[in-house]
Every structure is written in structure tokens, then in C-alpha cells.
């Protein structure tokens, strides 16, 4: 049986759980999403393995290495206006974290979302499932599975 856990605890940046356990994997995912913003992008780098691979299969986008991944995140931030994230669920094993969320935003340019499915200017309601692979206590792979829809709630 696989050991899984959901994130109910508040994770302290200065006191990470021991590497190799489910709680450490959840700690990585928690701080990944906390640092996923333009002001703290430099902190995100500390969570990534040097050999990080970032992929969104539905848009056929893949980035290798910290520099490429962080530059891509900077472009994503420039492409979104009024972003809002609503977590759905998160669970983990020691080597994987799955995170399901709803993200709404206005797509203001294409730089951060190559091969996107909806026109620039559209308000987007995107369902995203992240699959984080953990190795040596760091995120070595981040796969994002996106479902793009026009946001009809605006």
C-alpha cells in the first residue's frame, strides 16, 4: 500500500521535514505555490533540482534546467492579469505530489502560454493538475496538465 497524506499542517520554511518522507514532499509543493509569484520567483529556485524538467504536455511545452524554468515562469506572470487560484486537493507519496487547482485569469499575451487554446483577451478558467517528481529532497520534474475553458463566471 502507498503512503499518502494531505496537507493540513502549516509548513515552516525554516524547519523543513526530513528529506525522503511524504511530509517533505508536501512541504516542497506548499512552498512551490507560495513562491509562484513575480516577487518571490528567486525563492522558487531553491526548491528545484539542477536537472529540473518542466512540462505541459497538452501545449507541447518543455523546459530544462532552473534558468529556463524560471524564465518561463516570469513570462507566465507577464501573460496573466487578475490571477486567482483556488486549491482543490493535494496528496503525496515520498517521491510524488499531485496538486489539483482551479486558476482564473485574463490572458493578456501569448509569451507565457505558447500553443494556448483560447484567444488573447479571454478570461480563462483553467483546471490544472500538477505532478511533482521529488529526488534528493528537491523537485526534479514538474508536469502540468491543463484544461483550458473560457471563464463564464465573469
Positions of PLM-derived features:
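C-terminal and inter-domain tail/linker signature
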Residues: 2-154
